[in-house]
Design a protein with these regions (language model features):
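An anion/pyrophosphate-binding glycine-rich loop and adjacent beta-alpha core
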Residues: 32-34, 40, 54-55, 182-185, ...
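A glycine-rich dinucleotide-binding beta-alpha-beta segment and adjacent secondary-structure elements
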Residues: 126, 132, 302-382
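N-terminal Rossmann-like FAD-binding beta1-loop-alpha1 element of flavoenzymes
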Residues: 2-27, 400-405
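Conserved N-terminal/central alpha/beta ligand/cofactor-binding core
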Residues: 30-123
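Glycine-rich loop(s) and the adjacent beta-strand/alpha-helix scaffold that form part
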Residues: 153-199
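Conserved beta-strand-loop-beta-strand element in the redox core of flavoprotein oxidoreductases
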Residues: 132-149, 154, 219
């Protein structure tokens, strides 16, 4: 069988290296090198998977977890780790079960996959743009910038539309549509959130907060919450908690939605009030602006002082109980109105893509067109941050590779 795989990213490279040698595999990549998006994954360290059991893994898939069940059980994170290690890549498991190459270099992951596909006899065609895919009878014609390729099967592994500079420009959606596949509108997922009060976030830009509780309040009701780390940006908020939250709110109307940060989640209102009171006793002769240094990061103090409504030069010993309670409320509810999610180009992954109702979950073959497959981010599946999205790419690639090897 002659097989063309379109896209030399994570799923395309792994599928190429896994399809049995009885087939002729041609991997077509529009960039000058393979794995361009992999290269920047995990800030250049490449979080290859999450070392957890399939059941726990599926709890971290935000969109279409049920569809992924067969593939995740069929090729687990343990299998990914074994494959990479057998091919010479040493791995290390870090906090939150996140798995990285020991070298901390994403380039080593790309090298490992490149070696595996060369060992498998795959023909790689770089700098080759696929313009269209058509089918006549049982034969596919893949029209490229370097001429047509005829083949028996096509695997679309073109990714989503996030980080377009890496080549993810939504080409796969075009190919899917040409075969009458439905595309679920692509949206940003795992992305920063932009807020209305950018005058405040600009002042706090670069400030990272650890161990905070971040909630999303919509029409007065809490709809999602995350505990952990976050960072302020010129336009709003980002960091691990925010990225996870973005995956949960990218399908809702963001009018009347706010981000609420509990700066002291370990303390109840009463406990925090006692803590503030004891600090005020300790600094009783100081001005208010100089009395919060034990409680808050230096960069945050001027903002909290201003928003508290207490004059900065007020002596601490004359601050009323009511003003103190307002301050405690602010520390437990440091709120920002949501303006929008960051544009899809800035998102870590794309939510949306080829509708899973039209794909066989066991093989990732199109239910509409025989021998046409869709794997990786081009499919409407996405997960939280922590190596889950790459595992989706690996598992879907292997499901297709096994089907094509039969």
């Amino acid at each position: 069988m002659r097989i063309v795989i379109i896209g030399g990213g994570a799923s395309g490279m792994l599928a190429s290296s896994m399809i049995s040698k009885n087939n002729k595999v041609i991997l077509v990549e529009k960039n000058e090198k393979l794995g361009k998006k992999l290269y920047i994954t995990g800030k250049g360290r490449c979080n290859v998977t999450n070392d957890c059991a399939p059941r726990e893994f599926l709890e971290n898939v935000v969109t279409n977890a049920k569809f992924m069940q067969s593939a995740i059980y069929g090729f687990t994170s343990e299998d990914t780790m074994a494959f990479l290690e057998e091919n010479g890549l040493s791995l290390v498991v870090e906090r939150g079960n996140r798995v990285f190459p020991k070298s901390n270099k994403s380039s080593d992951v790309i090298k490992t996959l490149s070696n595996a596909l060369l060992k498998n006899g795959v023909e790689v065609r770089l700098n080759t743009v696929v313009e269209s895919v058509k089918k006549t009878g049982d034969t596919f014609i893949v029209a490229t910038s370097n001429g047509d390729i005829e083949c028996d099967a096509v695997v679309v592994a073109t990714g989503g539309v996030s980080y377009p500079l890496t080549g993810s420009t939504g080409d796969g959606y075009k190919f899917a549509k040409s075969f009458s596949h439905d595309i679920v509108r692509p949206k940003a997922s795992l992305c920063p959130i932009r807020v209305v009060e950018q005058n405040v976030t600009k002042e706090l830009e670069g400030l990272s907060l650890k161990n905070v509780d971040v909630s999303v309040i919509k029409d007065g009701k809490k709809i999602v919450g995350e505990f952990g780390e976050m960072i302020f940006t010129a336009f709003g908020v980002s960091g691990p908690t925010i990225l996870s939250i973005s995956a949960n709110i990218n399908k809702i109307d963001l009018n009347n939605t706010k981000i609420s940060i509990d700066l002291k989640p370990a303390l109840t209102y009463e406990e925090l009030d006692k803590r503030v009171l004891s600090d005020f006793k300790l600094f009783s002769n100081k001005e208010f602006k100089n009395a919060l240094s034990d409680l808050l990061p230096k960069k945050l103090i001027p903002v909290i002082v201003r928003l508290s409504g207490i004059k900065e030069d007020t002596k601490v010993n004359v601050i009323s109980a009511e003003n103190r309670k307002n301050l405690v409320h602010l520390l437990k509810n440091f709120d920002f109105s949501v303006k929008s999610l960051a544009p899809i180009e800035e998102a870590v992954v794309t939510s949306g893509g080829v509708n899973v109702k039209e794909i066989n979950p066991k093989t990732f073959e199109s239910k509409k067109v025989q021998n046409l497959y869709f794997i990786g981010e081009v499919v409407d599946v996405d997960a939280y941050t922590g190596g889950f999205n790459l595992q989706i790419a690996w598992s879907s690639a292997v499901a297709a590779a096994r089907a094509l090897s039969r």
